[in-house]
């Protein structure tokens, strides 16, 4: 059952709401416009608040639904977390869009909502505070994502390895942003 759910999670994660909504609305392809990221923040820049919110909600659900399905199937928390990681992998490397996806932050937040809601609240709160103070989405993601690790190590240690892998994937996807942050070239809102 685990492998079937992991595959379904990857396929669901491969649905890029940013790309689909940009095509349906006639907005620029987020992979080749703005920041080049197929995610909610770039959709806000390119297509406005409404499509950005729809992208965010879709990406959150892509992370949440596979975890809830894994729980309903009776998988333990460790397996649920790996199923969620597969959904994020689908978002990062979508099968349907030549493996050119987003950075996985919203999908990871949805996954955390299903695994351990307090960790999701911590990450979302840290993201919002950092973004409010710096107006920099990438910095907010890079601060918020690793903050969940100590809480999960304490409260849900069986999810720690998958969440550590998830954190590494998100940091890796932000490597260009890290270079731009250090060089003072990162985009701000």
Curated annotation (Swiss-Prot):
Membrane topology value: Multi-pass membrane protein
SMART domains reported in the protein's UniProt record: G3P_acyltransf (SM01207)
Pfam families: G3P_acyltransf
GO MF: acyl-phosphate glycerol-3-phosphate acyltransferase activity
Pathway: Lipid metabolism; phospholipid metabolism
Localisation per UniProt entry: Cell inner membrane
Highest taxon, organism lineage: Bacteria
Biological processes annotated in GO: phospholipid biosynthetic process
Cellular compartments per GO CC: plasma membrane
Keyword annotations: Cell inner membrane, Cell membrane, Lipid biosynthesis, Lipid metabolism, Membrane, Phospholipid biosynthesis, Phospholipid metabolism, Transferase, Transmembrane, Transmembrane helix
Reaction catalysed by this enzyme: an acyl phosphate + sn-glycerol 3-phosphate = a 1-acyl-sn-glycero-3-phosphate + phosphate
Enzyme class: transferase
This enzyme's EC code(s): 2.3.1.275
Transmembrane segments: 1-21, 50-70, 77-97, 111-131, 151-171
Cross-referenced InterPro entries: G3P_acylTferase_PlsY
Principal place of residence: membrane
Family to which the UniProt record says this protein belongs: Belongs to the PlsY family.
Entry-linked NCBIfam families: glycerol-3-phosphate 1-O-acyltransferase PlsY
HAMAP family: PlsY
Quaternary structure and interacting proteins, as annotated: Probably interacts with PlsX.
PANTHER family: GLYCEROL-3-PHOSPHATE ACYLTRANSFERASE-RELATED, INNER MEMBRANE PROTEIN YGIH
Protein name as catalogued: Glycerol-3-phosphate acyltransferase
